[in-house]
Amino acid sequence: MFMLRVSRRGLATATSVPRLKTFKIYRWNPDKPTEKPHLQEYKVDLEDCGPMVLDALLKIKNEQDATLTFRRSCREGICGSCAMNIGGANTLACLCKIDQDESKTTKIYPLPHMFIVKDLVPDLTGFYQQYKSIQPYLQRTDYPADGKEVLQSIDDRKKLDGLYECILCACCSTSCPSYWWNQEEYLGPAVLMQAYRWLIDSRDQATKARRTMLQNSMSLYRCHTIMNCTRTCPKGLNPGRSIAEIKKQLAFD
């Protein structure tokens, strides 16, 4: 019986019709400065590939072109490494399902309006420097005398829901036109949402300094409520609302 099942499975695999899906992927190699950026076409058999775009990218890299370069790590939407522009939208390749229509070509680009290291790898140095600039850590002038942790109420803890889940993938910031044109000074949706996360943390005692840092014409107020950030967030968060809440706080300063 076991041999019969194995033979039937093997026959089904051998006779299955390939379902070839076309992917056009952005390619650029800094080691070849005379070669312009271009889209390179690959075909992947959907019958022999996982359901996510990252599965297709790994299959291409492992079986067709080892030079294809992209970031990836957890494959579970936790690390944010595989953020890229897929089919015109910023998202995570590990969470983006492959369009099963073989007649449609899927185009994959790096996150838009960023310097590119190679292929699908954006340079996030500036993005991380902006994140560092908001001092994203607990700041206090005094601590409990007994040396224990600083506690907060259940209600205060709930205020952080929808904020701390950000994985800093930069999908939202790189979908924002204001960030495209002003990223040297405008902090962008992702960083501002984290700024708000620390502004409303009941345990933090640097609220005044944090507000002062944001009270200028560029760091915060380049947001024009386009809301691309909220639409594209792969974690379902709402950076636009966080920015609006910061503006409300600063209006009373």
From Swiss-Prot:
Protein's membrane topology: Peripheral membrane protein
Localization (cell): Mitochondrion inner membrane
Residues reported in the UniProt entry to bind [3Fe-4S] cluster: C176, C223, C229
Protein name according to UniProt: Succinate dehydrogenase [ubiquinone] iron-sulfur subunit, mitochondrial
Pathway where this protein functions: Carbohydrate metabolism; tricarboxylic acid cycle; fumarate from succinate (eukaryal route): step 1/1
Organism: Candida glabrata (strain ATCC 2001 / BCRC 20586 / JCM 3761 / NBRC 0622 / NRRL Y-65 / CBS 138) (Yeast)
Subcellular location, principal: mitochondrion
The UniProt record lists the keyword Transmembrane: no
Protein residues bound to [2Fe-2S] cluster: C74, C79, C82, C94
Domain 2Fe-2S ferredoxin-type: 23-114
NCBIfam families per record: dhsB (TIGR00384), PRK05950.1 (NF004616)
Domain (4Fe-4S ferredoxin-type) ranges: 156-186
Reactions that this protein is recorded to catalyse: a quinone + succinate = fumarate + a quinol
Keyword Methyltransferase annotated: no
Residues binding a ubiquinone: W181
A single GO molecular function term of this UniProt record: succinate dehydrogenase (quinone) activity
Residues where [4Fe-4S] cluster binds: C166, C169, C172, C233
GO biological process: respiratory electron transport chain; tricarboxylic acid cycle
Family indicated by similarity: Belongs to the succinate dehydrogenase/fumarate reductase iron-sulfur protein family.
Pfam families cross-referenced by the UniProt entry: Fer2_3, Fer4_17
Cofactor(s) this protein requires: [2Fe-2S] cluster; [3Fe-4S] cluster; [4Fe-4S] cluster
